[in-house]
Amino acid sequence: MFLEINFYSTFFQRRPSLWKERCKFEEVDAQGNSISYSHHPPDLTGQRSPLTPTTMRIVDRIPTVVGFRVIPTTVLVLLTYLTIFTLVIVTDWLPEPPKNQNGLDLKQAYTDLRHITAHPHPYNSHYNDAVHDYILSRVRPVAASTSFVHISDDQTSNGSWASPGYGVYFEGTNILVKIDGKSSNGNDGVLFSAHYDSVSTAPGATDDGMGVVTLLQLIDYFAKHRPDRTAIFNINNGEEDWLNGAHAFLQHTWSNLTDTFLNLEGAAAGGRPILFRATSTSPVRAFRSDYVPHPHANVISSDAFARGVIRSGTDYEVYTGAGAEMEGLDVAFYKGRSRYHTKYDAVPYTNGGERSLWAMMETAQGAGNALLNAKRHKQDQGSGGTPVYFDLVKAELVIFYLNDLLIYNVVSLVVGPISLIFFVVCEYVLRNERARQPNGHPVSRPSVLEWLKQRSWLRALWRRSKFWIALVITIALQALLVWGYLAFNSFTVYSSPYLVLISFFSLAYLSLVIPLTFTFNQTQSPTAKYIAPEREKHTLLIQVYIFTWILLLFSTIAVARAQVGGLYFVTAWNTGVWIACLLAAVEGMMLPVPQGGPRVRFHSAHHHHHHEHEEDQDADDDDREQRQPPTEATPLIGYSRASLRKPQEGGVVGWWIVHLLLTIPAPVLLIAQMGSLLLDSLPQTLADGSPAYVVYAAASLTAVLLAVPLTPFSGKLHRGLFFLFFLSFLIVTAYLWLAFPFSSADPLKVFFQQKVTLSNVVSERHSSIMGLSNSTVHPTAGVRKVVTAITGTPYYLKNEIIPRLPSASGKELKCRDEKAKRGLVTCEWESTLVPSPGGRNPWEDDFAAAQGRVGATSKSRQSWFKAEVARTGVRKGQIVLQGRNTRSCRLYFDSRPIIKYVVEGGHEGMQKGYEVGKVGASEVRLWSRTRDREFVVDFEWEDDDGREGEGITGRIACEWVEYESGNLDNGDGQWDLQRGGGERAKIPAFEEVLAFLPEWAVASKTTDGLVEAWSPFSV
């Protein structure tokens, strides 16, 4: 601005006659009244401009390019946001596997993956044995050729453990590999864990086939590159049935050799694996870019797991729980949860394919090398070592202690406001000292009445409050939009999370920028016009600082009371805005001070009344005028917009760029990364019963936090952005409210189970013990009722899915709210599609001998299990149970919980830290490594209300998971269907679901068994 004035001063020096001919002055007093008069130009004799006209033209363009003006500000803000969003998106893409695979063999791993995931292979299936044998065949040659590699095919470990409400007895079939370290002290080994069982409804490519084949590669690698510490590989079985394989590992002697673990898991359908959870800072250091080429980690995922936002469980919970108390890492896939535990968790449907597998292998190798060979940091253990961690565009990992974050936050809460107040006061004092008229006297102040008439108090009040008004409007409109999504199409975020974010962000931009750019009309001097945008920006910077200070206060409380580490971005944001405010105060000390006395305006004699154009046109006109060299016919000052700038076109060169770089890139990058993680992991948890409002609130909060950093610069953003965001909001929101939310790529998940009620054939007899009665459930008890139950989201389940199933046609549908999966309903109906347990009937010979006729064979096909129940004491009982072609049975105690149970032949006592609690156990889950195993369970209960001697009632049940389409021979040669003899297991109702579900829906399991057959008992 001053450079332009200097240019015209030089021009008038060379042609002073033109001044008198073509110019006159207009004086404006303090009340805004104008007085016009003619005047001669100042005496410029002897003054020479140090710049030539050509140089002046170059210098004049500097404010246009880097000044705090509309075009430069808009361009830089857009470039900043687009660069950050592009980085977040592009760095999340999976790169092609390198040719140099650092001792790993991706091709072999992919071959292993296809073998392991050829069929669903849950613990209670025949194909589970085939997978076990295949893995064993892969590791045995390694142990045979290397002296420090040892294998344990664990067929002996068993135990009992309890969780709130239920108890477990489990017999493990884990495959353990030990690689002796070069300098291990005996108990500082590292555990590598993955599970080779899948759920009954999925082949398990990502859950957890990729984890298993990664461990196979690490075994080969560390056998050739012996580590410093001992490595234990637990390729366990039974994780899907509530983490049983990890519990079984704790029963093995090798569990005493480890104090750190790396667990590989899959909670989705591929993509890039993330460090989901970590116990302490020391193991997280293994994820630094020195070891892991593309670290992907964020502590917010750990916060989400801890608070039940993501309903899932991994072996991490066992390894960190009572009895183990190890420190370690949980690495898992998280994208595409709609395919999790479904038929789409298969090799052909994996998100990323070989690239996804390589990402897991590369991550595990890097972290494993660090854990086995890097120096330990024992000081990190304990509460002081709780970590805060996040990656920066998959290139670097930032790690620090949660306690350090707390200390820094507390200091910032105190030092920040005090220092800022000091700088602002200094700015005010210095500006008042400089605010004097040319004669040195203080500037005259208008009277109170004049001040009120001028409404400058109203302008000042609006300038200092409009940020908060805009924020309140934004929050209200965001809440209204959340309600709109919940009311019109609550599942639209399921398949279009990023469109939902665009909708929220567009609205946030509009609701913030429109109030902030509203101003009162006022008459300003050229100097005031010059500094007005800067003062506006400074005011908004302070408002944003106050906003981040409030966020920092709540963040500090969350860190101190709830150990929430995911709010680290607030700390970074507050620090950046604080520094920007300090610099703004320094800038304010240097800005020209608008004078309160008469102000002079210049007008051309030929254009006394000049109408200002719109801001963008004004800037373009200036550029054209500055490109034209002056001549004698060139219009004088009246045609130069330099002295008639609108307030929006003022601004100091350079300062605003520093402010922008301090306040926008860091918080926007951190928030964008966090928002991307939330939008990739949360939306499809709606099918699991997660509240929809939580997902939309997360998207809304992300959008608002992304928009707030640009508010100090809102006055200089081009009006075209308003129309762009307005149109995008209308179009995107309308589409999302009308679009069908599911597709074959993002199917809605429903949960299946069939229940078979057996006839209660009980024979009464008297026991020699206290004359108490006993009962027997005969193996030939007939099927009394078969009920098919499907769980899912209420509207689509009742109106779009169940009506498509032939077996449900014309049947009475009974629906109830699901307690285990809140937000979902279970609808059931009686079915004529009767399942068959398959296998060989273990009681066929006994039944034929008892009946003395061949006809018993046909009746034996109805057999499911055999059970005997006896009262062995006042508060004691015994159940003998044998299921047909199954490894899994259950005991339900409906009338009262039991306080103790013991399984004959099992490990004595309960696992340390997992004893039956005070509330007792209403259910006991029994798992054996062999089929047709006879369980003998002794149990005790407490009397209620002193009613000693009363018995107990409940149900005896067994589970089945195999169905024909899941066991088809695919020619891989891995499994002989008839190895156990007998018939094939059949679940025709599940086959019906697979055949008749719409293409936008997919089936998963409700619980451990797809079929549960049960019969009541009392004792």
Swiss-Prot record:
Q: Per its UniProt entry, what is the enzyme's top EC class, as one word?
A: hydrolase
Topological domain spans for side Cytoplasmic? 1-69, 426-466, 519-539, 587-651, 714-719
Q: Does the keyword Amino-acid biosynthesis apply?
A: no
> How the protein sits in the membrane?
Multi-pass membrane protein
Q: Which GO terms describe its cellular component?
A: vacuolar membrane
The record's comment on cofactor binding reads: Binds 2 Zn(2+) ions per subunit.
Query: What processes does the entry annotate via GO biological process terms?
Result: proteolysis
Record's keyword terms, sorted: Glycoprotein, Hydrolase, Membrane, Metal-binding, Metalloprotease, Protease, Transmembrane, Transmembrane helix, Vacuole, Zinc
Q: List all membrane-crossing ranges.
A: 70-90, 405-425, 467-487, 498-518, 540-560, 566-586, 652-672, 693-713, 720-740
As recorded in UniProt, its EC number(s) are: 3.4.-.-
Q: What role does this protein play?
A: May be involved in vacuolar sorting and osmoregulation.
UniProt similarity note:
Belongs to the peptidase M28 family.
Q: Specify the protein name.
A: Vacuolar membrane protease
